[in-house]
Amino acid sequence: MTLRSLILEMRSRPHRVVHDLAAAAAADSTSVSSQDYRWSEIPEELLREILIRVEAADGGGWPSRRSVVACAGVCRGWRLLMNETVVVPEISSKLTFPISLKQPGPRDSLVQCFIKRNRITQSYHLYLGLTNSLTDDGKFLLAACKLKHTTCTDYIISLRSDDMSRRSQAYVGKVRSNFLGTKFTVFDGNLLPSTGAAKLRKSRSYNPAKVSAKVPLGSYPVAHITYELNVLGSRGPRKMQCLMDTIPTSTMEPQGVASEPSEFPLLGTRSTLSRSQSKPLRSSSSHLKETPLVLSNKTPRWHEQLRCWCLNFHGRVTVASVKNFQLVAAGASCGSGTGMSPERQSERIILQFGKVGKDMFTMDYGYPISAFQAFAICLSSFETRIACE
């Protein structure tokens, strides 16, 4: 999110919440300086102009850490607000830095996003919804482009809509389908095996600036998506299953913890790892020795009056489409130690995707998957399935 939207959204909270923040700030010191008071009570119009200039200095995209620290140093009230924004999305529900796109979403809510499709350029843009309206401009998060090959199709995912090169630092991963469009593999272009990364960083001769750009980038499988045969063709609901290779079932337990990367690796670091080094990725982590999490789509019900298959998207989907789906933890992934009954666990939506316009779709996701993983799964829904439809 932009600094402007973060601060203005927090300042627009109910008066009681703002008062609590002020009281907490006052508790840090017996007296609050007049300068702190002036900054905390600055008119919203003037605050907006200041933040616009700060965003312009950052290039209009993601806020730099320098800008976040500078805002935190303005006064105690701003420091408390900034403390909330830099917490991981699992707790704050905020996407403050690019690495937030690779971190799990919130546990108790869903991050509301939407996808815009361009049929001419075969591109897809993911935006973060800044309001409850389905028509807002949103904050750009990720972009993807479709590349057709003889035996497969690739969806290249990037941090920039104007740079889809796999050799770019903006490259974050890809989705590859088989010829029939029934099986997909999600590759993470920024995931480093712990052993290989440690050796590179400890090496005295390692210099990222001197690494040849011709060395192929490493991509590591993090999820497998499967669409099953639909006997009703395009008239019936799709049946899909997602095997999350890097997310163990224990993350669904009350005290479960999902892995949270803290930064993107340097391009040079990523380039020097060969594809063969990605094979021991699963065994290199104690987390991945457990059974991986399996997500399956929630079965829709047939509505006799409307004569269509229905799911409750709580107003987030307005157009009936075979692409619409909701993902929940599969029964085998719930486990007996989750502290939650299988019936209740099956009602917890982890990812939902649906159509709201000709080329507009909503995407809402939550813990334990990230925005990148959710976007990759949704991209698979756009592919034509020769064997299923």
From Swiss-Prot:
Segments of skewed composition (Low complexity): 273-286
A Gene Ontology term for the protein's cellular component: plasma membrane
Domain named F-box: residues: 36-82
GO process terms (BP): regulation of DNA-templated transcription
Region of interest called Disordered, as start-end residue ranges on this chain: 250-289
SUPFAM superfamilies to which the protein is assigned, alphabetical: F-box domain (SSF81383), Tubby C-terminal domain-like (SSF54518)
Tissue: Ubiquitous.
Family: Belongs to the TUB family.
PANTHER family (alphabetical): TUBBY-LIKE F-BOX PROTEIN 11 (PTHR16517:SF99), TUBBY-RELATED (PTHR16517)
Protein name as annotated: Tubby-like F-box protein 11
Organism of origin: Arabidopsis thaliana
Record gene name: TULP11
